[in-house]
Amino acid sequence: SRGLGDVYKRQALFFDPAADTFTLRQWFLDRPTEEKEMLVSFFTFLSDVKRLVHFNGTTFDLPYLTHKALFYQMEDPLSSIASLDLYQALRPFQSILGLSSMKQKNVEQYLSFPRKDQLNGKQLILVYHDYLQTLDEKKLELLFLHNYEDVLGMGSVLELLALPALFHGDFSVQSCRFTGQALEVSLQPEREVPVFLSRVCADGSLTAFGSRVSLSLQTHTAEL
């Protein structure tokens, strides 16, 4: 995230093979004059990363970090790292999910992810600058809480990748029968669908949850 031009915080959740556990690491800019040093540390960390998973980083975060690398005449590690943008991957399924917005907090709420942080990015910039003036530990806690829950929340959002996998054909057909008016198909997805989905349209219906997906396609007869 940034505050009036400065990258003031970065965070990453990564698997540590040595410890056999996931570790959350945060970088925080408590002195704006040390922005370059923080970026050097963050980019050094990325040098061993094979893939980035983020939420809507394609639109802002990644281009902004690339801009900062150019500004400080640093090597940009992002260009050589594979990237998965959860927002871009899930946005086509907004209507199926029945969501009015695909903001991360909206998706998390849909998935019943428990979140304490209630601040948005613009509010956090003000909190950050207040912290620089006051060094109030409570404001610092708010900043770290937001980052912490942003990263953990993506863990729950990841489960929704079952939807693009399903629509890309990652399933096996369990049964298929014709009732005379509709074609009833039962599918088993490769990834379990984490939420109950039920959608109906003029040409059929779809229900999905867990390891079961049911598809009903209405048939039409006509004379040539």
Q: Each PLM stretch: what is its role?
A:
Residues 3-8:
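Short, small-residue-biased leader/transition segments that mark boundaries at the very start
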Residues 9-14:
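Basic, amphipathic juxtamembrane/active-site segments
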